Amino acid sequence: VRDGNGKIVLVDNGTGNKHLKQLSYYNFFDLVDLKDELQRRDVACEDVTDVILTHLHFDHCGYTTQKEEQTGGKPLFKMAFPNAIHWVSRAQWENFLHPNALEADSYFIENMQAVYDSGKLRLIENDTNLCPGIDLRLFDGHTPGQIAPYITTPERTYVFAGDVIPLAASVSPLWISAYDTYPVVSYNEKMRMLEEAASEKQAVIYCHDAYTQCTTVKKVNDFFKADQKVSLFSIG
């Protein structure tokens, strides 16, 4: 996201390539190199000013660091976005450092150690304004302290739902992911997000959906459904 005032903000950065062999049972396919994708948009990794990490599961922050082999020594992990402030909630950071049994396999310390060492980690404890037009709001359920960026343009507000609503099909309130650590909390938090999205005509971005990137949502009695598809190009 470009804010028009010099900020280039990246929301999550995917699985990366450091642990693909270790995670091969997920059967990843059609993976792309994020650096190449950014270059296609005339953005270098060094240009990114802020990285918002919705949470620290490997599939959302794996590209935060890159592995460099050291001759005769341990591998070195360097920041992929060396000039960027990295935004994480304090609740998620504490969960990352001291994970519960259900989430332990989703966290890799090497994804974040270089960021911590650099001093470019910013921990938020409450809903926070990053800059004009970008607000960071906290949601629990899938994991403690997940950040959902709310990106406001002249046309509408976009909600990067992360794993609060990972797929368009997940708009159905009772469809809770098996990966959610606290399913009842997930339901309540999803309803909170959907009520506002429907009433304010916000567009919800689905980060795990291969077919539907973004839609508005519509309330039907006590339930919700994905409604009109929305282009993401107007975000900037």
Name these PLM-found stretches.
Residues 1-36, 40, 148-163:
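Conserved beta-strand hairpin/beta-sheet module of binuclear metal-dependent hydrolase folds
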Residues 13-16, 56, 91-92, 141-143, ...:
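Active-site metal-binding loops of divalent metal-dependent hydrolases
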Residues 25-32, 36, 154-236:
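Cap/insert and terminal regions of metallo-dependent hydrolase folds
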Residues 62-74, 215-218:
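Metal-dependent catalytic neighborhoods of phosphoester/phosphodiester hydrolases
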Residues 65-68, 137-147:
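Active-site glycine- and acidic-residue-rich loops that bind
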Residues 29-43, 47-59, 71-138, 187-201:
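Metallo-beta-lactamase
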Residues 9-11, 52, 86, 158-160, ...:
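Residue-level marker for buried hydrophobic side chains located in beta-strands
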